[in-house]
Amino acid sequence: GCSGNKGKCLYCFFPSLLLFLQGEDNFTYCPATGLAKGNEHSEFAGWAFPFPGVFLVEEFISEDEECEIVELMDRDDWKPSQSGRKKQDYGPKVNFKKQRLKAGGFTGLPSFSRQIVAQMKACSVLSGFLPVEQCNLDYTPERGSAIDPHFDDWWLWGERLVSLNLLSKTVLSMSCDSEDTIQLSPTFSKGELSPPGSLTQTSACRNSGKEAIEGVLPPRLVPSKEVTVAVHLPRRALVVLQGDARYKWKHGIHRKHIEHRRVCVTFRELSAEFSAGGRHEELGKELLEIALSFQGRPV
């Protein structure tokens, strides 16, 4: 909470960062409804809001495929990365600050990704998705692996971020730094949003702090900074972030959500600037041709 020391209170400036550091998410994403629902023991129990831009496919690959993929990865070296992670990169050499890149030693995505990319075509949300870069990340509790809340670059990388979660479950924690507010609506017992102004008996009534007039519970506005949304990723699940989940909400993973070794395979597509009709269309074509040869080694 706030220390009352105005101008110096971190909580006033970075509530979403502090929530992240404490490892507590106060909403959980529901794939069946597309809603972020207030967690039972939070002040937001019984409230929810639409959380667009997350697409989840459970059991995207089989156990045998998972085992084979990780075995092939482990034949190559894992390079130390930040926050206790290790990585293998398959992509062009990029300086994001200076917005410069060169194909350099990029030899394409690895051969084992050909089948993964082919399977993606069955997902309507991945129509036309052409991965130009792959990053494998290795997390273990022994190294205290985590990843701070961040946005992926959008100068080079396009709208859809695609990740395959291997070896163990985890939780993607979504946080927002914007000055916006989020409109929460009370939920019915079935977990659906109640229409505005409807008669409702929900846990939201008990947690709103105000008596609803004659049982009518108005929507509730909360600062975006006070909201963090947990997106549960089962083992072997594929997750796609796009739209608001890509550009408005940062994603990160708490240390406490790495219980066993976890390997994440992230694929990225080109931005409009490097695609057909874009300023760097020719360079984009060259990179895609290399990527989709599927003959790559880690760079």
Mark where each language-model region is.
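Non-heme Fe(II) oxygenase metal-center motifs and adjacent flexible, charged/small-residue loops
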Residues: G1-V299
